[in-house]
């Protein structure tokens, strides 16, 4: 049954490919003849190696390549002629039974793309998150920016910013410099001793018992106290054990936050020092972050809704291909993090089975919904998105050139626009419930890709 595609199941197919031996022999000889012109062998000049020696050395390998090249070409011709959409790569096996003497036969097993049924989008439920940016959010951001530019001054010292008050004892928010030594059963341990150690009280950098013991100390004072390390402490050699610590305070400095004035605005890149312009820029940046996060959350909601209302079988070949991509992505990530031997590290593909299945499913669903509803990314849409992105930069035209000068970056923006088209299309048809959350709640939620 040469050239007839057999149905082996939902997506599995098989076709027998018959190839005349004469064709294989003819092409093998042609390839060997071309090879003989460049092959190098000891004792012969390039191109002067006898054909018999070339055949002996390379004949079997070349014939093997010709067989499978012809099988692949024949497979492509048959599936294309019958308009069969092949998913992934076919598997070729040599067939030996029931084959004519003057032919070679292969059995190609493969999968086809599934039929994708998109259900009733009107029944899909999507939550659309909304967040408003007001003065309170801008004020909080200004406070964060002030804390990032904090200056510390010694308590009790008079100066341009005062002395931080008459109380020279260490308080939460103060930066302290101290020496400490810890012992377990009277013996010092690794990491339990330091000189001129600096940290800010109340930020949670140290264990609570350590910070509590430091509070209220004045310069020159010492204090001894017991400290029990948590059972899950990162230092396994001391986890769950009790140490006796002694701390000696050497310096206490209070935090001076810069005033919100023209000098502060200039430090943030506002050329004329306008506080009003600074706040406007902060609002714009916060609104951009809100747009990014809410769009990502909405996209995730839409994708989940599409998965729920769609029916399709998933080709194993595509899942396996995506597993390989995810393994390589994980390996590159480990390399970037400085993991030694990341290139050779064994990463089981099975770790990514569920993720790959979901990605393949969504890819097939999106392709179907885009094709059926004409949701392809239009050039003017892509340009509008790039222009919107470029507005936040000093030289928008340079950003535009940067995007249009690289096909990969342009393809990424095209994919983004296409996803937007799908999201908008689904939201127009689905049951959409708006949910308003604060900026703090929005940023506390896990960021979506």
UniProtKB/Swiss-Prot annotation:
> What GO cellular component entries does it have?
cytoplasm
MF terms (GO), sorted A to Z: peptidyl-prolyl cis-trans isomerase activity; protein folding chaperone; ribosome binding
Q: What SUPFAM superfamilies does the entry give?
A: FKBP-like, Triger factor/SurA peptide-binding domain-like, Trigger factor ribosome-binding domain
Q: Does the keyword Cell inner membrane apply?
A: no
- Output the GO biological process annotations, alphabetical, semicolon-separated: 'de novo' cotranslational protein folding; cell division; chaperone-mediated protein folding; protein transport; protein unfolding
> Cell division among the record's keywords?
yes
Tell where it localizes.
Cytoplasm
Ranges where the PPIase FKBP-type domain occurs: 173-258
Top enzyme class: isomerase
Q: Which reaction does it catalyse?
A: [protein]-peptidylproline (omega=180) = [protein]-peptidylproline (omega=0)
Known function: Involved in protein export. Acts as a chaperone by maintaining the newly synthesized protein in an open conformation. Functions as a peptidyl-prolyl cis-trans isomerase.
Protein name stated in the entry = Trigger factor
Question: Which organism is this protein's natural source?
Answer: Cupriavidus metallidurans (strain ATCC 43123 / DSM 2839 / NBRC 102507 / CH34)
